[in-house]
Amino acid sequence: MDSNPFLYHLDGRTVLVEQRLDNLPRFRGRRNFTIAHEIAHQILYRLFPDAYGMQRRTLCDYRRSSKPCKQITDWAEWQADTLGAAILLPEDAVQEGMFIFGLGDQMTVLSKKYSPNKFEAFCRMADFLGASRTTLSFRMEQLGLLERNLLCAR
């Protein structure tokens, strides 16, 4: 650890997870995605060491805030988000979850206001799968299982 208590030198094999994500059940989905996201960085770096920029990431300021549903501007982060979501939520698990929770083959809109029953079923599905609502909605969009996502209005 550096002399600054908020900066850590990362060796490329260490995952730094915020302590508040560790024990609280309401952060379980976010914690699981954070770990999957960091695993995705490692996979991408090992597959594409010359093209992937992990070697430049040696310091992490854990106070950096990240707003939910933010627009992705960093290609490496987008790749890790996408692969992390696929690791955490394989297509067959998402489709089976949609069946179990009565969401059909596809959702037209994800909205607490416009379709509260489906929204509640979606929330139960996210909890069941150990994913955050944001990650599950992102993955469903990737898979073409969600047409309009009002959870993260862009």
Each PLM stretch: what is its role?
Residues M1-R154:
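Active-site hotspot residues in diverse enzymes, especially metal/ion-binding acidic/histidine motifs
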